[in-house]
Each structure stands twice: as structure tokens, then as C-alpha cells.
Amino acid sequence: MTSEPMIISPEPGRRGRAVRGTTLVIGDWTAEGADREVAPLHVHHADDEGWHVVSGALRFRFTGRQVTAPAGATVLVPAGTPHTFGNAGPGPSRFIIILPARLDELISQLHASEPAEHPEIYRRYESELLE
């Protein structure tokens, strides 16, 4: 199997795009809304996840502590670490998210399902809702 590297040119004004390889996804996302968490506290038992804040600020909540990551900060959450995150301010925050392809699939399934289905979806991806 031959793989070719991808070079993605910037596209002004475009939001929410992702570059997907076989095992890694790099997404350019914007968090709208003031001080709102994206998901309940959860854990990915087998996968790391990372964010780089481009503008604005993100608030991360871990078991027992909270951290605000301003523009320019990079946050790596190792597998097995309970976490959630959200926009920390009144304006939008733009960030790059780096995650395994299967966590991107998990997120897609969550967005396409009802909340009652979420615990089972997390389990299928070696993840767990904690709240």
C-alpha cells in the first residue's frame, strides 16, 4: 500500500474542515457560545487527543481541576485522562484538534444520534461518559 502526503492550502473564510488520513485527523474547528462545554466529562481509554488554540481561549476541565488555554497554547490529553472542554470566552474560539480517526468517527456518531444512545456509542470506541 502506497500513501501520499497531503498538503492543504489555506482557504480564507472556511471553517470546520478536517484533513483525514488513515489513522489521524487534523480538524480546524470553531467553538461558538460563551463558556459552554462541548461534551460531559468523559475518558478515552485507548486514545490521546490534542488541541492547539489559534484564537480566543478554551477551558479544559479534568478531574479536580480546570485550566484555561489561551491563543497559542497546545493541550495534550493522554489516553485514560478524564476531560472535557469548551469555549472560555464570550466570542468564538478557533482551534486545531488532532485526534485518531476513530475518535473522529465517535464524534460523528454522537452528532447523528440521540443523547440516550451516547453511553453505548462511547463504549464502542473504548471511551466512557463520566457524567
Regions found by a protein language model. Name each.
Residues 60-61, 77, 83-89, 94-97:
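Short beta-strand His + acidic residue motifs that chelate non-heme Fe in jelly-roll/DSBH
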Residues 5-41, 47-48:
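A short glycine-rich, His/Asp/Glu-containing loop-to-beta-strand
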Residues 28-31, 43-61, 98:
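Short, conserved beta-strand element in jelly-roll/cupin
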Residues 50, 57-59, 66, 82, ...:
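Structural motif
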Residues 22-23, 31-36, 57, 66, ...:
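Short, charged/polar surface micro-motifs in flexible loops or helix N-caps
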Residues 88-131:
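Double-stranded beta-helix
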Residues 64-82:
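Short acidic-glycine-tyrosine-enriched beta hairpin
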Residues 27-31, 50, 72-73, 83-85:
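Hydrophobic/aromatic beta-strand elements that line small-molecule binding cavities or substrate pockets
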